[in-house]
């Protein structure tokens, strides 16, 4: 084919792509559609968003366009919601209409399918309802909200304190030990076992979970989701989700071993056995979400979300204690008054410890570890803050804009536990405290996370005083964004009390 013949073909292809682009952006001209930066043909606003620091980028766009603004990522329409009023109106008032998740094409690489979507990224429908109901009821049956699970956590807290004591007051980074302790709680719930902190396979699993979570953000990921045809290019597809694939491979080995010890005649000892029991009941039902593929994804959901979020919050907590020794001393005084230095903390103590409870909540607010939550999608046309948002629009809920709203919090960008105390020193929780999101897709692990945060945090401060190592500079209180916001690397000294 000569060059002359290629020119008309190129013109036709260009016109076709421009028409497709025009069709996808025509909703921007509809009445009351949220404002936003002008999208480029084909790419939309992909080049306008800094995916390495999305929260900051969204904050700048909010200043230009207001609390409800629009983007177009290639041909995917997106609306970003900022501030308590907009977020609550979308997720609570229109809860049924915003409970869906947008398609995430790259998850096909991990084996996602119509009946194997796990819980967190599952589309809103029968499969999600089935798995949400199963997860909540199984966690409850395994002891969530009861003494049995509380004892698991307090036992693990004792192991964590012993590991801290091994450093004999010398400087160390606490993150790895926090990951191991929180992971063992999840391992007990999902696989009925805990690991020694130096177990090589356990360490490999944790490393992959950490690296896999970083793959939840980034420019290439967003481009491949926005233009999924690019997934057919092996060189591109092979660059994403490498750690998540390796994590699932490791998890498959654990699940295979666990199946060999499962006795169907006995009551389930953990979530995996409960899932296997449901698979037996669902045999012959092609519509069931209880299948081998979904087992690994459900367990992976609980592992990845349940481990890193809680351990990151604890890492923020210890950082803020060494940066604010006056707050640390007040927490320790309350622990001494209510619990003493011998008895292990219990959830029943929390009601008598308003200051410690306020500090933990302020750690969550200030750390702001999941600033953008998880994306939602509208299942029908809705109206938010006077703007019309069409069916099929992806929603980003900027939780950071709620947790650090100047209209709600006295000192939004400072660590200030008094945000959660009234004039009489009683604990209060403002409506704008939404670290677990809100609505039908709010985090199902919230009760477990609250238990872990209280028991691990109080156990550590009961046994140790934490400080900045002598001769080292004061650590930064600024975080690092990679889907989660983690503290900048720091060391501390844990001196036994």
Swiss-Prot record:
What are the names of the required cofactors? heme
- The EC code for this enzyme is 1.14.14.-
| Family listed | Belongs to the cytochrome P450 family.
- Which parts of the sequence bind substrate? 301
Gene Ontology molecular-function annotations? anandamide 11,12 epoxidase activity; anandamide 14,15 epoxidase activity; anandamide 8,9 epoxidase activity; heme binding; iron ion binding; oxidoreductase activity, acting on paired donors, with incorporation or reduction of molecular oxygen, reduced flavin or flavoprotein as one donor, and incorporation of one atom of oxygen
User: Known InterPro entries for this protein?
Assistant: Cyt_P450, Cyt_P450_CS, Cyt_P450_E_grp-I, Cyt_P450_E_grp-I_CYP2D-like, Cyt_P450_sf, Cytochrome_P450_fam2
Which parts of the sequence bind heme? 443
**What name is this protein filed under?**
Cytochrome P450 2D6
The main location is endoplasmic reticulum
């Amino acid at each position: 084919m000569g060059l002359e013949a290629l020119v008309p073909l190129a013109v036709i292809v260009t016109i076709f792509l421009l028409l497709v682009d025009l069709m996808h952006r025509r909703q921007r001209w509809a009445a009351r559609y949220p404002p936003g930066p002008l999208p480029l043909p084909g790419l939309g606003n992909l080049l306008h968003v800094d995916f390495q620091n999305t929260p900051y980028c969204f904050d700048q766009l909010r200043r230009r366009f207001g609390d409800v603004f629009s983007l177009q990522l290639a041909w995917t329409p997106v609306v970003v919601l900022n501030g308590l009023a907009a977020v609550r109106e979308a997720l609570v008032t229109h809860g049924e209409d915003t409970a869906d998740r947008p398609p995430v094409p790259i998850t096909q690489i991990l084996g996602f399918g119509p009946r194997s979507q796990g819980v967190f990224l599952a589309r809103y429908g029968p499969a999600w309802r089935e798995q949400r109901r199963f997860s909540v009821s199984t966690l409850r049956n395994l002891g969530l909200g009861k003494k049995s699970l509380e004892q698991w956590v307090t036992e693990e807290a004792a192991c964590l304190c012993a590991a801290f004591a091994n450093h004999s007051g010398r400087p160390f980074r606490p993150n790895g030990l926090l990951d191991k302790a929180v992971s063992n709680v999840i391992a007990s719930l999902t696989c009925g076992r805990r690991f020694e902190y130096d177990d090589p396979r356990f360490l490999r699993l944790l490393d992959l979970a950490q690296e896999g979570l970083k793959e939840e953000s980034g420019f290439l990921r967003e481009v491949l989701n926005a233009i999924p045809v690019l997934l057919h290019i092996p060189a591109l597809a092979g660059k994403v989700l490498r750690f998540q694939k390796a994590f699932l491979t490791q998890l498959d080995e654990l699940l295979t071993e666990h199946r060999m010890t499962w006795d169907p005649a006995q009551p389930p000892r953990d979530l995996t056995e409960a899932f296997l029991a449901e698979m037996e009941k669902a045999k012959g039902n092609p519509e069931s979400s209880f299948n081998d593929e979904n087992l690994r994804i459900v367990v992976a959901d609980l592992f990845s979300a349940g481990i890193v979020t809680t351990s990151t919050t604890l890492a923020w907590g210890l950082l803020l204690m060494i940066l604010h020794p006056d707050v640390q001393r007040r927490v320790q005084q309350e622990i001494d008054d209510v619990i003493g230095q011998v008895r292990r903390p219990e959830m029943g103590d929390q009601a008598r410890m308003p200051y410690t409870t306020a500090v933990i909540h302020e750690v969550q607010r200030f750390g702001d570890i999941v600033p953008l939550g998880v994306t939602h999608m509208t299942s029908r046309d809705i109206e938010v803050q006077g703007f019309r948002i069409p069916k099929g629009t992806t929603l980003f809920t900027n939780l950071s804009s709620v947790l650090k709203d100047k209209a709600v919090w006295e000192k939004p960008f400072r660590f200030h536990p008094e945000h959660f105390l009234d004039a009489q020193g009683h604990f209060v929780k403002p409506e704008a405290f939404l670290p677990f999101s809100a609505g039908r897709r709010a985090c199902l692990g919230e009760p477990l996370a609250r238990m872990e945060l209280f028991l691990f945090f109080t156990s550590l401060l009961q046994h140790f005083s934490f400080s900045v190592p002598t001769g080292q500079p004061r650590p930064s209180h600024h975080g690092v964004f990679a889907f989660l916001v983690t503290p900048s690397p720091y060391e501390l000294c844990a001196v036994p009390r």
